[in-house]
Amino acid sequence: MTNIRKSHPLMKIINNSFIDLPAPSNISSWWNFGSLLGICLALQILTGLFLAMHYTSDTATAFNSVTHICRDVNYGWVLRYLHANGASMFFICLYLHVGRGLYYGSYLYAETWNIGVILLFAVMATAFMGYVLPWGQMSFWGATVITNLLSAIPYIGTNLVEWIWGGFSVDKATLTRFFAFHFLLPFVISAMVMVHLLFLHETGSNNPTGIPSNMDMIPFHPYYTIKDILGLLLMITALLVLVFFSPDMXGDPDNYMPANPLNTPPXIKPEWYFLFAYAILRSIPNKLGGVLALVLSILILIITPXLHTSKQRSMTFRPLSQCLFWLLVADLLTLTWIGGQPVEHPYVIIGQLASILYFSIIXILMPLTSFAENHLLKW
């Protein structure tokens, strides 16, 4: 008798995706982040669903409903802080996942990579809209500043912003639609994740050497399921420590004040995971230029497969490219720090230099270094 796991139409899909899936025998812990992201997404949808049961998307009651969740709902505070800090874990895993892809040349699986970049945009949009929902000071002013950037688009900008706002300022209509989209988008993201995996399973996983591993594959279960569970336990531990010991570490104190359109906070800044992009936006004095740089800072990932000039896929055996990669990481950390600082000397010039370096490394220095390494191989 055939095993039901291999014969049942639905079980067969699960089996071929998570159990009998052939995986390279040498993939390291950097390959754990895909499964961690899946668990982060499930956690966010689950906690978000329970929060939505108690939340009201009305300007008059939104702030109070969040307070009510924290004070009156059974374990509502756990739900809220799991959701808020779960987003931070989500972005940590996302950035490490993308970094892994850049380091090991996984971007050469163009379809998987491009869906991944679209996913990154979708997750960032969802997180931004979620940050608006508690309707605190930073929520309101963050929404105002970021949506206002669209007014830089020539000709249609102003109309577009008012259309998104549903009026002449960020108000009740804006909050309601942001809640609707914040609820809807994670399900769209889930569907896109399936497409992401579909494309990945067409080619199979890359590995640290960047050499095809077709002749040396092992089943995903039990080897990588056990390995993923270890990563999961470490992530859950970190998340729970954050939630129970320092739940407001990543938040902004201003967001504990109800939104007031008549009082602008002294420094408007987004959550930490958007600070690098915010720093790039602020480093350009021109409004449209800043918006373009902001979008391009993420969109540049789309063209990385076309910028790959090396004869080797992975950076494992390319020391010069490795130096550039870690310079890029240091540059992104610098941008993240600058994004949280006030707009004054010396932060402005540091931000501008870091922004120039960011685009230079990806678009100019990486391809040139790879080209040089190809010639060094001949010596």
Swiss-Prot record:
GO terms for cellular component: mitochondrial inner membrane; respiratory chain complex III. Gene3D superfamilies: Cytochrome Bc1 Complex, Chain C (1.20.810.10). GO terms for biological process: mitochondrial electron transport, ubiquinol to cytochrome c. Heme b b562 binds at residues 83, 182. The keyword Isomerase does not apply. The chain crosses the membrane at residues 33-53, 77-98, 113-133, 178-198, 226-246, 288-308, 320-340, 347-367. This is Cytochrome b. Heme 1 (or BL or b562) is low-potential and absorbs at about 562 nm, and heme 2 (or BH or b566) is high-potential and absorbs at about 566 nm. Keywords: Electron transport, Heme, Iron, Membrane, Metal-binding, Mitochondrion, Mitochondrion inner membrane, Respiratory chain, Transmembrane, Transmembrane helix, Transport, Ubiquinone. InterPro entries: Cyt_b/b6_C, Cyt_b/b6_C_sf, Cyt_b/b6_N, Cytb/b6-like_sf, Cytochrome_b, Cytochrome_b_C_euk/bac, Cytochrome_b_N_euk/bac, Di-haem_cyt_TM. It comes from Myotis nattereri (Natterer's bat). The keyword Ubl conjugation does not apply. A ubiquinone binds at residue 201. The cytochrome bc1 complex contains 11 subunits: 3 respiratory subunits (MT-CYB, CYC1 and UQCRFS1), 2 core proteins (UQCRC1 and UQCRC2) and 6 low-molecular weight proteins (UQCRH/QCR6, UQCRB/QCR7, UQCRQ/QCR8, UQCR10/QCR9, UQCR11/QCR10 and a cleavage product of UQCRFS1). This cytochrome bc1 complex then forms a dimer. Its cofactor is heme b. One of its GO terms (molecular function) is ubiquinol-cytochrome-c reductase activity. Binds 2 heme b groups non-covalently. SUPFAM superfamilies: a domain/subunit of cytochrome bc1 complex (Ubiquinol-cytochrome c reductase), Transmembrane di-heme cytochromes. Component of the ubiquinol-cytochrome c reductase complex (complex III or cytochrome b-c1 complex) that is part of the mitochondrial respiratory chain. The b-c1 complex mediates electron transfer from ubiquinol to cytochrome c. Contributes to the generation of a proton gradient across the mitochondrial membrane that is then used for ATP synthesis. Its main location: mitochondrion. The lineage of its organism: Eukaryota, Metazoa, Chordata, Craniata, Vertebrata. Belongs to the cytochrome b family. It is a multi-pass membrane protein. Heme b b566 binds at residues 97, 196. It is found in: Mitochondrion inner membrane.
